[in-house]
Amino acid sequence: QNXLDFHR
């Protein structure tokens, strides 16, 4: 899982 997934 990518912590940068917040950019959605």
From Swiss-Prot:
Pathway(s) of this molecule: Energy metabolism; oxidative phosphorylation
Record-level GO BP terms: oxidative phosphorylation
User: Disulfide connectivity?
Assistant: none
Where does it live in the cell?
Mitochondrion inner membrane
Q: Which UniProt keywords apply?
A: Membrane, Mitochondrion, Mitochondrion inner membrane
UniProt KW GTP-binding keyword:
no
Q: Provide the membrane topology annotation.
A: Peripheral membrane protein
Q: Name one GO cellular component term.
A: mitochondrion
Primary location group: mitochondrion
Biological function = Component of the cytochrome c oxidase, the last enzyme in the mitochondrial electron transport chain which drives oxidative phosphorylation. The respiratory chain contains 3 multisubunit complexes succinate dehydrogenase (complex II, CII), ubiquinol-cytochrome c oxidoreductase (cytochrome b-c1 complex, complex III, CIII) and cytochrome c oxidase (complex IV, CIV), that cooperate to transfer electrons derived from NADH and succinate to molecular oxygen, creating an electrochemical gradient over the inner membrane that drives transmembrane transport and the ATP synthase.
The record's family statement is:
Belongs to the cytochrome c oxidase subunit 6B family.
Subunit organization: Component of the cytochrome c oxidase (complex IV, CIV), a multisubunit enzyme composed of 14 subunits. The complex is composed of a catalytic core of 3 subunits MT-CO1, MT-CO2 and MT-CO3, encoded in the mitochondrial DNA, and 11 supernumerary subunits COX4I, COX5A, COX5B, COX6A, COX6B, COX6C, COX7A, COX7B, COX7C, COX8 and NDUFA4, which are encoded in the nuclear genome.
Under what name is this protein listed? Answer: Cytochrome c oxidase subunit 6B1
What is the protein's species of origin?
Rattus norvegicus (Rat)
Gene this protein is translated from: Cox6b1
